[in-house]
């Protein structure tokens, strides 16, 4: 089984983009070249601020969904290490 990772990228306007991949370095390089998500194209210098192993693809997708539901403050707490990523992986899914 291939290991998937969840990552957060900070844009120059301080927004946080959340994504999943099997290779964080490759995917971040794609984003920097403008070959990744449309949401990041033309946004200027990007900074990878968080990445963590998320298990299988389905587990990574669930964690990505949960993180995208967080407030900006909660995402900043995750980046700062004040909110445990493991809690995002194991939290019950919202209907």
UniProtKB/Swiss-Prot annotation:
CDD domains in the cross-refs: GIY-YIG_UPF0213 (cd10456)
Superkingdom in the source lineage: Bacteria
Residue ranges occupied by any GIY-YIG domain in the UniProt entry: 2-77
PROSITE patterns referenced in this protein's UniProt entry, alphabetically: GIY_YIG
Family: Belongs to the UPF0213 family.
PANTHER family per UniProt: UPF0213 PROTEIN YHBQ
Protein name: UPF0213 protein ESA_03545
Source species of the chain: Cronobacter sakazakii (strain ATCC BAA-894)
């Amino acid at each position: 089984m291939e290991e998937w990772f969840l990552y957060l990228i900070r844009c120059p306007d301080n927004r946080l983009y959340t994504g999943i991949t099997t290779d964080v370095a490759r995917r971040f390089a794609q984003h920097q070249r403008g070959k990744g998500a449309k949401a990041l194209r033309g946004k200027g210098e990007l900074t990878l601020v968080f990445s963590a192993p998320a298990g299988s693809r389905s587990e990574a997708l669930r964690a990505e969904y949960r993180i995208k539901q967080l407030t900006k403050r909660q995402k900043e707490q995750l980046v700062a290490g004040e909110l445990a990523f493991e809690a995002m992986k194991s939290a019950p899914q919202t209907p």
